[in-house]
From Swiss-Prot:
EC number: 1.2.1.10
Gene Ontology terms describing biological process: catabolic process
Active-site residues (renumbered): 129 (acyl-thioester intermediate)
Protein name as annotated: Acetaldehyde dehydrogenase 1
Family (UniProt): Belongs to the acetaldehyde dehydrogenase family.
Binding sites annotated in the UniProt record for NAD(+): 11-14, 160-168, 292
Reactions catalysed according to its record: acetaldehyde + NAD(+) + CoA = acetyl-CoA + NADH + H(+)
UniProt cross-references to SUPFAM superfamilies, sorted A to Z: Glyceraldehyde-3-phosphate dehydrogenase-like, C-terminal domain, NAD(P)-binding Rossmann-fold domains
Amino acid sequence: MTRTKVAIIGSGNIGTDLMIKVLRTSKHLEMGAMVGIDPASDGLARAGRFGVPTTAEGVEGLVALPGFDDIEIVFDATSAGAHVVNAARLLPLGKRLIDLTPAALGPFTIPAVNLEDHLEAPNLNMVTCGGQATIPIVAAISRVVPVEYAEIVASIASRSAGPGTRANIDEFTETTSSAIVEVGGATRGKAIIILNPAEPPLIMRDTVFALVTAADPDVHEQIRASVDKMVADVAAYVPGYRLKQAVQVTEIPADQPVHTLLAPDAERPTHQVSVFLEVEGAAHYLPAYAGNLDIMTSAALQVAERIAAGKADR
């Protein structure tokens, strides 16, 4: 079987973890290039030891590589600003882009929710690590009952956040909030990220709060079942993804001012759904606490595998 050649731009934590996943676990992909801007980066050094072609000259260095024409898919693991430049250079050359930054030039893509809708898109955006972990849960609740407001809190180990992640903090909240609405189906959404400085580093933890109208106990059970199914769907490509405890559906007290979170014309919801998750990494590059890397790179790999498999089927 002929494998699809891919390149990764960004030799930091995310790009390096993704490279190792492609090399060790991919069924349909082959590393064609690892691209960075720091000649001394660990990611480029590792790529060189693995025999992967490398360049420290950024996107122009990629285009200049002898094997560039054979590369079909390019993962961008840089920053939101850099992705704008990279996309402008690569899309006219016919490369498919999988964007692991919050730039969101292409459609938001969550494999367990809407991958099949975007397989032909030239540039797919992977939202954010927090989005990959929590938006499937919002979507699962939305499949049962309308979600007037959804709020997610992503807590990641500070040590797992490299310079690219830190540079994108504002874009993280904006992009994730938008995707909660666009992909998750909530009327309104908010995202909060916490870089936890605790030592030893703690595993990625995510919390989803959703405000719904669901007075019927049978609906509560439908919500729990939908969330359980979605967790299993995500865990199929992120094995360390799991519920921390049972889904909670609680009545909203009459004196709680939830109207401040809702659209002006929204009816007051009756219940809050609370979902608590944790994501343990596969430790391909960083230790297992870096589940935020693992869910992002695993989701991106799932997208590329599906694109490559679809090409092979045609």
